[in-house]
Amino acid sequence: MKSLDIDFLNHQAIPIEMGGLLQKLGEYKGRQGLFWRQTPQVLATLKQTAIIESTESSNRIEGVTVPSKRFRELMAHPTKPRDRSEAEILGYRRALAKIHAKPESFSIDEKTILSLHSQIYSRTDIPSGQWKKRDNTIEERLSDGRWITRFVPVSARETPVYMKELCMRFNRLMSKRKASPLILIPAFVFDFLCVHPFSDGNGRVSRLLTLLMLHQVDYTVGRYISIERLIEESKETYYEALNLSSNGWHEGRHSLKPWLEYFLGVLIGCYQEFERRVGEIKSTRGTKTSFVKETVENLPETFAISDVERLCPSVSRDMIRVVLNRLRKEGIISSSGTGRGALWLKRGNKRNKRGNKHGND
């Protein structure tokens, strides 16, 4: 486990293009404050959408899904889960909300990692908040249907020691400022995934940790644009980058380059989308019709009129109904049910099916 060894990092070939990505991310970070001060209402719209998208995408990557209508109900009014999938979705949202609310209250240590895992599974009967008890493998299904072992993580017996060392190395390098946080954070997440410390939930915990650590160094775009959604949209590249960088990991002969390029690329994509969305919403605020349309576009696949009302407080309910009915006539959305319990569905959206990876969570 050498990704967070300073000598190892110093010998990693960081191409000029990657240096350009780091510089660009620094510029995005520098502009954050301007948006925070000038567009608080726009950010409120984006924040609500990001929480929902992050919860849905991070779970869906691992094949944890519920029907669209039920998902919207769970997000709007958290209730008693009906099955394991619903319980894990609610648990993830709870952990995500805590990170968004007070990221500075978390330490990057074993206790925090175990706590995040425990929160995901808090409403299930699955043992949680503890390291794996049995060795595990990361497998891949080939096109002919056969399964192959892609990577063998750290053994269950060695996991506690590895996790303690991982947290210690990260905190030491962060405190000494030996390298950019945008190198150390993805290196930490990568080693975490290679250790694979849990029997289940590794992928989701890694994404919660990613968001938490980025918040702590003031790269807060994940609060408004779902990092998890961008990962889901590029999950084949995500798995490929992990696969390439994990070659030789046990011997300390691996290259972080593929994983770093992927990680930084996703973060760049989040900032680009953030600035574009803020600009689009600001430019449409002149007309209430356009504002409602933009809000609907940024909502999940299934939504209720109350979701639009919450994000468009300056627009009357009657006006929102007019716009929704117009969008329905245009074939952009359709409705299900009547009255206040009616749900609206965006048309033409296809939900991603479960990927062909097994054991990656």
Set out the residue ranges of the language-model regions.
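FIC/Doc superfamily catalytic core
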Residues: 1-361
